Regions:
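Nucleic-acid endo/exonuclease domains
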Residues: 1-114, 118-172
Length: 172
C-alpha cells in the first residue's frame, strides 16, 4: 500500500508533531497549577528530560502519547499498516528507553509518574487528574512524615535500677 501523501506533505505533517507543549501535557500542567502545585519543565539535568518536575515532591511526571510510547492494550496504540517493521522497532526502542530512564530516576531518589494520553480523554480526565493530585499529596506526606526511631532493648538497667549493690546493703 502506497502513501497517499507526497514526500513533502508527509514531512510537513510529521514535523508538526510536537514533543513539548502537547495538548495532554498542557492539560496536566493547567490542572497542577490550578491546584497550586509548582513545577519546572523538561529539566535538562535529569535523565529523559521529564515533562514536568516537582522538586518539592521529588517527583517527575511523563505525559506519554499512546502511539509514540507503545501503551499496551490501548486502542490509540495501533501500528500503521505500512512500514510496520520500522514502527515496531521504533516504538520498542522508545519503550526500552522509557524503562531505562525511569529506573535511573528511581535510583536517584525520584518518584516517577506516567500519565497516558488516553487517560486524559474527557470521559476520565477529571478522575485521572484528581488521582494525580492524591498521589502527589501521598508522596509528600510519606516523605516528610515523622520517622519513628527504634528503642533497642538491652538488659542493662540505667535509671531506677532494682539490683544495685548499695540498695542490697541498706536492706540488710
Amino acid at each position: 500500500m502506497t502513501d497517499r501523501l507526497t514526500k513533502e506533505q508527509r514531512h510537513r505533517n510529521m514535523s508538526a508533531v510536537r514533543s513539548k507543549n502537547t495538548k495532554p501535557e498542557l492539560l496536566v500542567r493547567k490542572y497542577l497549577f490550578s491546584r497550586r502545585f509548582r513545577y519546572r519543565l523538561n529539566h535538562p539535568r535529569l535523565p529523559g528530560h521529564p515533562d514536568i518536575v516537582l522538586k518539592k515532591y521529588r517527583t517527575v511526571i511523563f505525559v506519554n502519547g499512546c502511539f509514540w510510547h507503545g501503551h499496551d492494550g490501548c486502542k490509540y496504540s495501533v501500528l500503521p499498516k505500512t512500514n510496520t517493521e520500522f514502527w515496531e522497532n521504533k516504538i520498542q526502542r522508545n519503550k526500552e528507553r522509557d524503562i531505562r530512564e525511569q529506573k535511573e530516576l528511581a535510583d536517584m531518589g525520584w518518584h516517577c509518574i506516567t500519565i497516558w494520553e488516553c487517560q486524559l480523554k474527557p470521559v476520565i480526565r477529571e478522575q485521572t487528574l484528581e488521582s494525580l493530585a492524591y498521589t502527589l499529596n501521598h508522596i509528600y506526606l510519606n516523605d516528610r512524615s515523622v520517622k519513628l526511631y527504634e528503642i533497642q532493648e538491652d538488659n542493662q538497667l540505667l535509671a531506677a535500677e532494682s539490683d544495685c549493690d548499695y540498695m542490697k546493703e541498706n536492706l540488710k
